[in-house]
Design a protein with these regions (language model features):
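Flexible "arm" and connector segments at domain edges
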Residues: 1-60, 64-108
Length: 108
């Protein structure tokens, strides 16, 4: 779980640099996508075991921080966002149909 203290540190890092002025929804979303692509690039042409844990942590950290900044921009509670999404996923992927099956929900 990401603590309130950690989220506050992320926001303080941003505020100390006066970067909030650049953090509009579009640019935060684009930055999140860029960082997610950098995460994907770690796996490009490699097996799972060939990926550096340190690089994985670095890129995953970037993705998570931009997600937190975007949620904060829209005053979203991340715990609520995740709980709501889990509820939706439980409805889309009932255990009896989805267990051991990677098929998308609309094809189950």
């Amino acid at each position: 779980m990401i603590s309130k203290e950690t989220i506050e540190k992320i926001l303080q890092f941003r505020n100390d640099r006066d970067w909030e002025q650049f953090h509009n929804s579009k640019d935060l979303s684009l930055a999140l996508s860029v960082e997610a692509s950098e995460l994907l690039e770690l796996f490009l042409w490699k097996g799972n075991e060939d990926v550096s844990s340190e690089r994985l942590k670095e890129e995953l950290g970037d993705v998570l921080m931009y997600a937190i900044l975007l949620a904060e921009k829209h005053q979203l509670n991340l715990d609520e966002v995740i709980q709501e999404k889990l509820t939706q996923n439980n409805q889309k992927y009932p255990v009896q149909k989805a267990r051991g099956n990677a098929t998308k929900y609309d094809k189950l």
